[in-house]
């Protein structure tokens, strides 16, 4: 199971204070050093703890199968692309199994992944992804989130706007019965978006993976079977 953390817990690491380190950065470092999913990701070869979130989403909803075309929005550092590559059995030689990953930050190569280093919001980015797909996508997934500022309402709205943009793009490229996955932060303003998504997909669910930090308001919107 992806959430089997036996051997990764109960190894608390203290972080020494430093004049050069702010309180918030010290707290972040302490959380990273003591996060069992961070340790597990390092051992399992995943580039981020977020990989386990997608694995849990797949275990719950059975989204990925071989011979799929997948778009990964906001892919860096590549954890979700790694998971998708394994689940669809992607390779650099099989064009039927293809992942198009987009991020403004560079990511190291993943088997079966075509990486587009662009800002998703630039005018020509959508067309570049569509050309790279060479057809319709089976899954569009987005783990994009704005840089948080610690103000929950603002963080909620900013990430919701990213989700809305990803949703509008998904409608353009998904084939019928395709799936859409995206991160949102709970905060109340997401209801209008949910109504839009429900009009376009047969099944829409909310899911919070156990690998998502308990204090985080993030949840994942899982929209199944585009109409």
From Swiss-Prot:
Catalytic site positions: 183
Catalyzed reaction equations: uridine(2552) in 23S rRNA + S-adenosyl-L-methionine = 2'-O-methyluridine(2552) in 23S rRNA + S-adenosyl-L-homocysteine + H(+)
Molecular-function annotations in GO: rRNA (uridine-2'-O-)-methyltransferase activity
EC number assigned by the record: 2.1.1.166
Swiss-Prot/TrEMBL keywords: Cytoplasm, Methyltransferase, rRNA processing, S-adenosyl-L-methionine, Transferase
Gene3D superfamilies: Vaccinia Virus protein VP39
Keyword check for Repressor: no
Compartment annotation: Cytoplasm
InterPro entries: RNA_methyltr_RlmE, RNA_MeTrfase_FtsJ_dom, rRNA-MeTfrase_E, SAM-dependent_MTases_sf
Residues annotated to bind S-adenosyl-L-methionine: 78, 80, 103, 119, 143
Keyword presence, Cytoplasm: yes
EC top class, as a word: transferase
One GO cellular component term noted in the UniProt record for this chain: cytoplasm
Annotated function: Specifically methylates the uridine in position 2552 of 23S rRNA at the 2'-O position of the ribose in the fully assembled 50S ribosomal subunit.
Family the UniProt entry places it in: Belongs to the class I-like SAM-binding methyltransferase superfamily. RNA methyltransferase RlmE family.
Protein name: Ribosomal RNA large subunit methyltransferase E
Species: Rickettsia rickettsii (strain Sheila Smith)
Gene: rlmE
């Amino acid at each position: 199971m992806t959430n089997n953390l036996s051997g990764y817990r109960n190894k608390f690491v203290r972080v020494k204070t430093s004049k050069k380190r702010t309180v918030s950065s010290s707290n972040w470092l302490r959380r990273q050093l003591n996060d069992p999913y961070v340790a597990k990701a390092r051992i399992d070869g995943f580039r981020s703890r977020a990989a386990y979130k997608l694995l849990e989403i797949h275990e719950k909803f059975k989204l990925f199968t071989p011979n799929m075309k997948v778009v990964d929005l906001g892919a860096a550092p590549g954890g979700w692309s790694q998971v998708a590559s394994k689940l669809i059995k992607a390779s650099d030689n099989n064009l039927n199994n293809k992942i198009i990953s987009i991020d403004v930050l560079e990511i190291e190569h993943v088997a079966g992944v075509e990486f587009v280093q662009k800002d998703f919001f630039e005018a020509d980015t959508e067309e570049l992804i569509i050309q790279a797909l060479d057809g319709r996508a089976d899954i569009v997934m987005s783990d994009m989130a704005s840089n948080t500022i610690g103000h929950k309402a603002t963080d909620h709205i900013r990430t919701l706007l990213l989700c809305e943009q990803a949703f509008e793009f998904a409608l353009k490229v998904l084939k019928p019965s395709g799936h859409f996955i995206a991160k949102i932060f709970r905060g109340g303003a997401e209801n209008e978006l949910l109504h839009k998504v429900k009009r376009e997909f047969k099944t829409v669910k909310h899911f919070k993976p156990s690998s998502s930090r308990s204090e985080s308001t993030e949840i994942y919107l899982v929209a199944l079977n585009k109409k």
